[in-house]
Amino acid sequence: MALISLAIDYKKSPIEVRSEFALSGLDVSMLYRSILAIDNVVHAVILSTCNRTEVYLEISDLRVVDDILVWWQGYVRNPNYKIKDYFKLRQGTEVIMHLMKLACGLESMVLGEPQILGQVKDSYTLSKKNHAIGKELDRVFQKVFATAKRVRSETRIGHCPVSVAFSAITLAKRQLDNISSKNVLIIGAGQTGELLFRHVTALAPKQIMLANRTIEKAQKITSAFRNASAHYLSELPQLIKKADIIIAAVNVLEYIVTCKYVGDKPRVFIDISIPQALDPKLGELEQNVYYCVDDINAVIEDNKDKRKYESSKAQKIIVKSLEEYLEKEKAIISNSAIKELFQKADGLVDLSLEKSLAKIRNGKDAEEIIKRFAYEIKKKVLHYPVVGMKEASKQGRSDCLVCMKRMFGLNVEK
């Protein structure tokens, strides 16, 4: 079984590309059913956030990568975007190292951001719910979560108040000096939307409107604040008229706010959704200011220096954690092989022993039977090692011959 991952992220792909290849907003159960239906795909975990879409897989044949790319391409709306031009393939240990760094926030646009760990955990949970995760992949994710927990407790990488949500609010503050007199509309009440809401409430705006598909979730977030209100997405045309700042963090497959919704009133539009929820053409109107996820980079760069030292400490923890994981996996593989070896030997002995005992019970010469039994066991036990040594010799594999000699306690110098 091989471990691989296929990824499209902000490092190689701009927002319009990431939007096309995003798997968020689609039916999760359908996604898992379809990917597990591909021959040689054994287990899978799908992660889709605003900055990346990644698929982690246990496969039985590396040639299946082409089939997975075809599967992914099938969800792309614009045929001009070809996944082979953008994806990154990782294999084996590289997958585990990347996932550890990712969960610790070291691969994020915002170095050390804590939200990614929750997103990775959510993806893992959905995979388990859809019976898509196996023992090996499960062990990988459990070690990843333990590593992230250790990094958070032993470093200060997550202590600076920096996230995509925080950076979005920073951009809004740069455009509007006095937010206390402004109305803010947040679209989406998911994890990022809730984080946006917290940052906005700290600025004490005149009014906060939170719109979501299900109003119950929005109500739960806004209920403790007198200047906050919960709304359905269907109310967006009316809400936009009132708003000075519109921030979107929602999973949609097409723009839900376009130029037809806005008049001449100056507004700040910030879209951190993938795929994009706010039409970029909003920024072409003279009175508006428009930002997308990629524009947040400038804000993030200002905060990177504060976290670089903590990042190096986190890297050391990750390297150590990976070494621990690999050692444990070696032991698991070794123990499994040893168990199988003993089971094989038991099968050989049991069959020959039963035949020998039956002959003795029938009055045959016990000494002769025991000698014959010992000879048969020796022959059966050594059959496959002898075949293997002959094959290794034919292929000039002296390393295999040395290994086999050591296994049987033979002199490796001869």
From Swiss-Prot:
Pfam families: GlutR_dimer, GlutR_N, Shikimate_DH
Record keywords, A-Z: NADP, Oxidoreductase, Porphyrin biosynthesis
Source taxon at top rank: Bacteria
Note: During catalysis, the active site Cys acts as a nucleophile attacking the alpha-carbonyl group of tRNA-bound glutamate with the formation of a thioester intermediate between enzyme and glutamate, and the concomitant release of tRNA(Glu). The thioester intermediate is finally reduced by direct hydride transfer from NADPH, to form the product GSA.
Quaternary structure and interacting proteins, as annotated: Homodimer.
NCBIfam families named in the record: hemA, PRK13940.1
Function comment: Catalyzes the NADPH-dependent reduction of glutamyl-tRNA(Glu) to glutamate 1-semialdehyde (GSA).
Protein name: Glutamyl-tRNA reductase
Gene symbol of the encoding locus: hemA
